[in-house]
Amino acid sequence: MDNEQRLKRRENIRNFSIIAHIDHGKSTLADRILENTKSVETRDMQDQLLDSMDLERERGITIKLNAVRLKYEAKDGNTYTFHLIDTPGHVDFTYEVSRSLAACEGAILVVDAAQGIEAQTLANVYLALDNELELLPVINKIDLPAAEPERVKQEIEDMIGLDQDDVVLASAKSNIGIEEILEKIVEVVPAPDGDPEAPLKALIFDSEYDPYRGVISSIRIVDGVVKAGDKIRMMATGKEFEVTEVGINTPKQLPVDELTVGDVGYIIASIKNVDDSRVGDTITLASRPASEPLQGYKKMNPMVYCGLFPIDNKNYNDLREALEKLQLNDASLEFEPESSQALGFGYRTGFLGMLHMEIIQERIEREFGIELIATAPSVIYQCVLRDGSEVTVDNPAQMPDRDKIDKIFEPYVRATMMVPNDYVGAVMELCQRKRGQFINMDYLDDIRVNIVYELPLAEVVFDFFDQLKSNTKGYASFDYEFIENKESNLVKMDILLNGDKVDALSFIVHRDFAYERGKALVEKLKTLIPRQQFEVPVQAAIGQKIVARTNIKSMGKNVLAKCYGGDISRKRKLLEKQKAGKAKMKAVGNVEIPQDAFLAVLKMDDE
């Protein structure tokens, strides 16, 4: 193909993604677009076709992004090449969304006709506008009995500033309005710009590992051409590889001769090491490199850390391999080795949020067959010590002694909640209870309010979202972004079993809530830890000071069962012997701690 043909082809390429709040019908719309462009044969068609992970289908959510090439014959007689990049909608996976958008020129904004605009709809719109994408608004599910398309149209105009007349009314499930959406894509989404003669620049927006072919990177070509046999260079690491195959996804992988300007496809270059193909890096040709890399998207930092330990210590190395493989597709996952007296060897792992954490744990157990114990998640604290040095703490067990610390800073987030009017009181009460600071309240219309609070991330991370949903009967939507670290009056709470600290049960808590949290936790542990042959005291302590205590009673064995009548001194001797035995056991005895006990720290607020 010469450059003239490449330029002509470029004019007919449309790269777009679909963005929406969770559950507004994004994956169903993607299915319909695939069907209507005849990209998938009817017999291969299944619901949520682009959600390739079993977990995604089970939970009905999209976790990983996916890219597909489609052919569409428009009414103007031309055949267009569409690249559809499917994105997740959940707040933990905003990162995946920002990666998809970096590879597009336009986005379909899907809004539910009954629910209207929600918090994550707005968050994703701002991401799209930051990437200078053209937006095509679609109101989905218009055939629902509760649908109010006219109200939602007005919302889109008022809140996002898109013209009502540009809105397409559709129902992905019933195949209504899909043809109009396809025509609008041709009309609204601009063709990619880029020069086929310039040095190669390709953005890696995703990568996965194949045990036979090495790393497969999903790329978007911005300038230049790449084909099999080319020698490529990664601009971040400077490493060079020879390309063995380039191709496109039609959802199935299909090798092609070359990828050129505007194309979205995959590249295989027998890369064995995950770190050599970093998401966000720019690929260029070794023989004719580009002068500077593409503007990559911002790296997301983990917000939540927890310890993952294999139940069987033999699996320690397998766990490392599992985490490395998951990290390849999920650049926001971080991990480093850690050891715990209670749990042995494992990894301190960083996640974007609680859903992300659950999904990674479930994938490790399911895909790699490793049974895990997870410790309570914690956020990152900055400590300024009395000698002026600073320490970063992501594990409560490593918190320095309180008398050495001058100040502790914890991360705060700005939380935006959209709530029906009737529940404003309940939501504000929840935020106050979680140490929130009220910032702003906006009445969007006569039924919904937008409430903005600044909250400590540690309070949001545990079960804030669940409590918000239950306080509003499931109607609230929620989005948050990190703002800054603020000084707080925090203390480390240690749990002692039989006088020994259990490092995996330590947690960091605000001084005002320390007594209640400590008391609630020891009472909870009393019910979870099985009774031993000897009495076990459970204590909660701040430094040297015990703030709460309870005892787990011992199991009694009747040593007098064999004494029928007879001498009291004989009985006394047996009882004294039992008592001495229990005292000895207590001095050397270890207490087995079940997995539920580690999770008890999380479920503290449910009571």
UniProtKB/Swiss-Prot annotation:
<dbReference type="InterPro" id="IPR035647">
    <property type="entry name" value="EFG_III/V"/>
</dbReference>
<feature type="binding site">
    <location>
        <begin position="140"/>
        <end position="143"/>
    </location>
    <ligand>
        <name>GTP</name>
    </ligand>
</feature>
<keyword id="KW-0378">Hydrolase</keyword>
<comment type="function">
    <text>Required for accurate and efficient protein synthesis under certain stress conditions. May act as a fidelity factor of the translation reaction, by catalyzing a one-codon backward translocation of tRNAs on improperly translocated ribosomes. Back-translocation proceeds from a post-translocation (POST) complex to a pre-translocation (PRE) complex, thus giving elongation factor G a second chance to translocate the tRNAs correctly. Binds to ribosomes in a GTP-dependent manner.</text>
</comment>
<dbReference type="GO" id="GO:0003746">
    <property type="term" value="F:translation elongation factor activity"/>
</dbReference>
<keyword id="KW-0648">Protein biosynthesis</keyword>
<dbReference type="Pfam" id="PF03144">
    <property type="entry name" value="GTP_EFTU_D2"/>
</dbReference>
<dbReference type="Pfam" id="PF00679">
    <property type="entry name" value="EFG_C"/>
</dbReference>
<keyword id="KW-0342">GTP-binding</keyword>
<dbReference type="InterPro" id="IPR035654">
    <property type="entry name" value="LepA_IV"/>
</dbReference>
<keyword id="KW-1003">Cell membrane</keyword>
<dbReference type="GO" id="GO:0005525">
    <property type="term" value="F:GTP binding"/>
</dbReference>
<dbReference type="GO" id="GO:0045727">
    <property type="term" value="P:positive regulation of translation"/>
</dbReference>
<dbReference type="InterPro" id="IPR031157">
    <property type="entry name" value="G_TR_CS"/>
</dbReference>
<dbReference type="InterPro" id="IPR006297">
    <property type="entry name" value="EF-4"/>
</dbReference>
<dbReference type="GO" id="GO:0043022">
    <property type="term" value="F:ribosome binding"/>
</dbReference>
<dbReference type="Pfam" id="PF06421">
    <property type="entry name" value="LepA_C"/>
</dbReference>
<dbReference type="GO" id="GO:0003924">
    <property type="term" value="F:GTPase activity"/>
</dbReference>
<dbReference type="Pfam" id="PF00009">
    <property type="entry name" value="GTP_EFTU"/>
</dbReference>
<dbReference type="InterPro" id="IPR009000">
    <property type="entry name" value="Transl_B-barrel_sf"/>
</dbReference>
<dbReference type="InterPro" id="IPR013842">
    <property type="entry name" value="LepA_CTD"/>
</dbReference>
<comment type="similarity">
    <text>Belongs to the TRAFAC class translation factor GTPase superfamily. Classic translation factor GTPase family. LepA subfamily.</text>
</comment>
<keyword id="KW-0472">Membrane</keyword>
<dbReference type="InterPro" id="IPR038363">
    <property type="entry name" value="LepA_C_sf"/>
</dbReference>
<feature type="binding site">
    <location>
        <begin position="23"/>
        <end position="28"/>
    </location>
    <ligand>
        <name>GTP</name>
    </ligand>
</feature>
<dbReference type="InterPro" id="IPR027417">
    <property type="entry name" value="P-loop_NTPase"/>
</dbReference>
<dbReference type="InterPro" id="IPR000795">
    <property type="entry name" value="T_Tr_GTP-bd_dom"/>
</dbReference>
<protein>
    <recommendedName>
        <fullName>Elongation factor 4</fullName>
        <ecNumber>3.6.5.n1</ecNumber>
    </recommendedName>
</protein>
<feature type="domain" description="tr-type G">
    <location>
        <begin position="11"/>
        <end position="193"/>
    </location>
</feature>
<dbReference type="InterPro" id="IPR000640">
    <property type="entry name" value="EFG_V-like"/>
</dbReference>
<dbReference type="InterPro" id="IPR004161">
    <property type="entry name" value="EFTu-like_2"/>
</dbReference>
<dbReference type="InterPro" id="IPR005225">
    <property type="entry name" value="Small_GTP-bd"/>
</dbReference>
<keyword id="KW-0547">Nucleotide-binding</keyword>
<dbReference type="GO" id="GO:0005886">
    <property type="term" value="C:plasma membrane"/>
</dbReference>
